[in-house]
Amino acid sequence: MRTAMSCGGGLVQRLDFSSSDEEDGLSNGINEGPQKGSPVSSWRTNNCPFPITPQRNERELSPTQELSPSSDYSPDPSVGAECPGTPLHYSTWKKLKLCDTPYTPKSLLYKTLPSPGSRVHCRGQRLLRFVAGTGAELDDPSLVNINPFTPESYRQTHFQPNGKRKERPEDDCRTDRQMKYAEKEHPAVFQSKRFVLRETNMGSRYKTEFLEIEKIGAGEFGSVFKCIKRLDGCFYAIKRSKKPLAGSTDEQLALREVYAHAVLGHHPHVVRYYSAWAEDDHMIIQNEYCNGGSLQDLIVDNNKEGQFVLEQELKEILLQVSMGLKYIHGSGLVHMDIKPSNIFICRKQTELGQEESDGEDDLSSGSVLYKIGDLGHVTSILNPQVEEGDSRFLANEILQEDYSQLPKADIFALGLTIALAAGAAPLPCNEDSWHHIRKGNLPHVPQLLTPIFLALLKLLVHPDPVMRPPAASLAKNSVLRRCVGKAAQLQKQLNVEKFKTAMLERELKAAKLAQTSGKDECSDLPPMSGFSCRGRKRLVGAKNTRSLSFTCGGY
């Protein structure tokens, strides 16, 4: 390709480029430039009408900008008489697009690569997306919440350097050095930063992973939806807050529920927790779906039909919920909001021939399970931060800010819950009727209950929290577990029969041993006329036999 340029009406230079010179120009052309004080510099300053381009250091050039004409190119001396000529500066050639070659394979490949700090976004709905970049926000270890419900011993074990539980007194100096070093190496442990909801926002995981079926509940915190997870096809209960929680006073309540679920884990009488996340500053919690609704729904349906839960089913509810409370209290937590709307029902079909055991852990094999849910008011027994729940089920000592018997507040609320399921009128929120119940008076139950069960319910609402039975005692109460006494009796009889069987086996073994030893002695004796050792019989006459008797006279 040949190109000519004019300078002041005269021909300045004829440029000749060939394909073979293109690659050579990448390495040789950079060092060819006009020197300061040379005739070329005076020509560029005084005679040439083209704009003057400042000189640039060759170190500032990127690999894609190291493009210049061939080094074996020299100006025409015949033209230099009118206008001293020289090859144009590389920036001028780049503007004229004479030396830029962006279509080489190397340059095309370089332009297709993303920059180190860029993000690549994929179009379309895809569950997995590649996002390039440093990811400093996600990799920052200081943005980690500390669960307040984690046992103190567990927290100390996992949050101290080297996992040591206890240091010896003589190692105090070394311990201080280790702590300072650990603070430098692991600042997230010693200078933890609260991971607020706004920092956990992501794309709409709810719409991507779940298919909303219907709304199944609503409360003060938010709404609950029945959803199907697209991946596994199972039903889940998705709880979403009504309003944004980031930065609000309700944020701690939302996080408290997540903390409690994570610590409690899985128990057959506690609603199972799967995951939690934030979208648009709204907290979303994925829990187990209970197909039987709540106990409050059952009570409402019974009131419409003029029915109520019978005593046998009341005992089953009280037993299973007390077992859930036993697990929660054993974990060092209290629920603080036990009521019918927070007790959920799971109905499942039992297979034919499936035997149900009377053990505590085997109650999960029944056809109906009662589970405790809504852990938004859960607090620690040792370090209580009480957030009062429903005032209709609130114990009087909690109102007086006496937190010495926190687990017994759940027992009080459970007693009133069973009374409502038995057909009692709705509970008052205040006034004299509210205080009347706090004096140990059980609400009136329209159905006839057995005296022993009625006495147990009155004990649950006793004004003195010390007199109320703990959840562990309720889970083993003989009134609730009718088969406990019978099972103990049957177990005792079984042990007696096992002992008798063992004695008979010993006697049988001794008899067999004696019979074997008798045969050996008989074989060692010399043969006697008239006796047969095989049958131990006596021959009389020709072929007649008579049994041999060793009995003595007089006996």
Swiss-Prot record:
Subject to proteasomal degradation in the nucleus. It catalyses: L-tyrosyl-[protein] + ATP = O-phospho-L-tyrosyl-[protein] + ADP + H(+). It is found in: Nucleus; Cytoplasm, Cytosol. Detected in egg (at protein level). Oocyte-specific maternally supplied protein. Present in immature and mature oocytes and in early (pregastrula) embryos, but not in post-gastrula embryos. SMART domains: S_TKc. It comes from the Eukaryota. Residues 1-81, 149-175 are annotated as: Disordered. GO terms for biological process: cell division; meiotic cell cycle; mitotic DNA replication checkpoint signaling; peptidyl-tyrosine phosphorylation; regulation of meiosis I; regulation of mitotic nuclear division. Its EC number is 2.7.10.2. The modification Phosphoserine is found at S549. Mg(2+) binds at N342, D374. Oocyte-specific protein tyrosine kinase that phosphorylates and inhibits cdk1 and acts as a key regulator of meiosis. Required to maintain meiotic arrest in oocytes by phosphorylating cdk1 at 'Tyr-15', which inhibits cdk1 activity and prevents meiotic reentry. Negative regulator of mitosis. Involved in the mitotic DNA replication checkpoint. Belongs to the protein kinase superfamily. Ser/Thr protein kinase family. WEE1 subfamily. This is Wee1-like protein kinase 2-A. The lineage of its organism: Eukaryota, Metazoa, Chordata, Craniata, Vertebrata.
